Curated annotation (Swiss-Prot):
Functional description taken from the UniProt entry: Participates actively in the response to hyperosmotic and heat shock by preventing the aggregation of stress-denatured proteins and by disaggregating proteins, also in an autonomous, DnaK-independent fashion. Unfolded proteins bind initially to DnaJ; upon interaction with the DnaJ-bound protein, DnaK hydrolyzes its bound ATP, resulting in the formation of a stable complex. GrpE releases ADP from DnaK; ATP binding to DnaK triggers the release of the substrate protein, thus completing the reaction cycle.
Cofactors named for this entry: Zn(2+)
Gene transcribed to yield this protein: dnaJ
CDD domains assigned: DnaJ, DnaJ_C, DnaJ_zf
Comment text on domains: The J domain is necessary and sufficient to stimulate DnaK ATPase activity. Zinc center 1 plays an important role in the autonomous, DnaK-independent chaperone activity of DnaJ. Zinc center 2 is essential for interaction with DnaK and for DnaJ activity.
Bound cofactor: record note: Binds 2 Zn(2+) ions per monomer.
Cell compartments where the protein resides: Cytoplasm
Protein's name according to its UniProt entry: Chaperone protein DnaJ
Source species of the chain: Chelativorans sp. (strain BNC1)
Amino acid sequence: MKADFYETLCVSRNADEKELKSAFRKLAMQYHPDRNPGDMEAEKKFKEINEAYETLRDPQKRAAYDRFGHAAFEQGMGARGGFNGGGFADIFEDIFGDIMGGARQRRSGGRERGADLRYNMEITLEESFTGKTAQIRVPTAVTCDECAGSGARPGSSPVQCPMCHGAGRVRASTGGFFSIERTCPQCQGRGQIIDDPCRKCSGQGRLTEERSLSVNIPAGIEDGTRIRLAGEGEAGLRGGPPGDLYIFLSIKPHEFFQRDGADLYCKVPISMTTAALGGSFEVTTLDGTQTRVKVPEGTQSGRQFRLRGKGMPVLRQPQVGDLYIQVAVETPQNLTRRQRELLEEFEKISSGENSPQSTGFFARMKDFFETFGE
């Protein structure tokens, strides 16, 4: 299990950007592979520190992590963190560029894919049985309709950055034989700046609003299923493609039924007389129909009755599971004097044939201890 990112960097959850940067620099210097050659534990720690800082230094990724933890980044969710070449080099050069140098070509700036979003939805077992179409409202970042996502005021366009001349990188001499190359501080590596920002989105190219979406929940869907809605995540930056929306489904526990795959289980109490003499009872299945279950005489507590085809539908398949009814024989309570007399009389006239399991059990137990004591 991954360690908490805040604990990895030894900072509080309220740490600001300056504290995060300071903590990262200290720990990265301590565990850098060049300072710990051959130390696999140090290398592993160094990767964990990098991943934690790459996530927490980005406001959007940090917000997603604070809300969902590591689950926000599983299978494409949220940040694209980890020990990858591009993300790590940007972080390391931004902080250690003045002492480490390097001439790595920055990956192309400009268009950026929008972040993936997560939406938690709880449905009932009945809704899982029938399927449903749900209307949800999702707060998200959408492309600004005023500037069409460019961030520039309508009628104007982003211009080439005068500091890096569109390269996104700047180079400076260290005073010796080497020079260092760093992300351009003016355009943040994009190669362009916005002189006249859009007034509606303040130059961001995106706006935050709540969107209404229709989600199809197919019949037979199981607890923990994830539904991906491609392109329904946050809008991309500067014309980049949108992210995806992931619906995480949970099924509310049912009062009467438990589910195991496509099968359903239900426990039904029956009276002692029904179990002894036989009888029947009715159960209402998930499809709303009444089904009568016959109880043969001498039924024991725990016996199961199988109702074929009365379980859950199999997702996107024609098959249907079964419903298993387990009876629990209820011992009478609060007996009247007459009821007690009748039971006492029944006890007197009963034989081992009426209770073969208990009679046989105690006989075997007696034989065991007699043999054991010899």
